[in-house]
Amino acid sequence: MNSKWSRRQAMQSVAAAVALASAAEPMLRAQGGAAPHHTTKEDFVRLLTELSNWNRWGKDDQMGAVNLITPAKRKQALALVKEGASYSMARSAELQEAVDNPAPIVRKMTRVGSAAPGTGSGGTGDTFFISYHGYAHTHMDSLCHFLWDGKMYNGYSKEEVTENGAARNAILNFKNGIITRGVLMDMARHKGIDYLEPGTAIYPEDLDAWEKKAKVKVQAGDVMIIRTGRWARRDAKGPWPVAQGLAGLHVSCAKWFHARDIAILGGDGAQDVLPSGVEGVTQPVHLLSLVAMGTPIFDNLDLELIGREADKRKRWEFLVTASTAATPGGTGSVLNPIATF
């Protein structure tokens, strides 16, 4: 009886998986996606060389595309502020374990109010333990976070990252802050829906269509920000295993934003569509951005508020300011980027 029941369950699971796979391509068409761009692992490896910024800013460079945020670029971005209205693009700390958050932020109270005296001076305190890389917490990836064939951006060896942290391409290089123009490419609103379904790929044609509709061009030194509506979907349907399915950029978009000379890539997911569609390479957009181009990444932004505010104003460009933790040797940092209109 148990054996038959197990076989029946297995057959039902297979049938469900086949149905889901069969539905995937029509779903992409319904959401307005472009025709699939087939990319092999060999194509990806060629892109690592074709899109490389190694030595562009010198053999000792560790800033990568952030070099494109010049003093003139900062002044241009500051001039975008007309109202002084500012909005966070960070997800509030996720403290509860979930299928999309296996490493929640742990808060330990070291001093609580009830222990303080009733008169005179008192105080409270806490400690946070944060494993910020992954699919839940808003953070910035430094240029040492990903490697290919034992190398990170600008040819630095994997041996530069030890138990003592990263000696090259660490997050400390960005301690003076990010001040530049941000462009929100709201792909869900562009398609007239609340959110893109998991596994929906965004193609270069989609980026072109968004620019035409929004009448805004992504420029050199910008933070390019992609909203898929990932958190809106979570609010509507609950958490899901995002490593198995997440809307995002197809690897073919890498040429697009390399040509635009963006300084930083950001979005409400992992930037990559998951699955990536490139056999043997889980996150090709991450690899091309961090390793080849030296373009840091803002992962897991919460773009629901800024999406509504930008749509209300029909203004998709704004000042972006962000500051990392000044952590020597860090491979990244928690982050609270601010958009100001």
List the predicted regions and their residue ranges.
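General helical secondary-structure elements
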Residues: 3-4, 25, 223
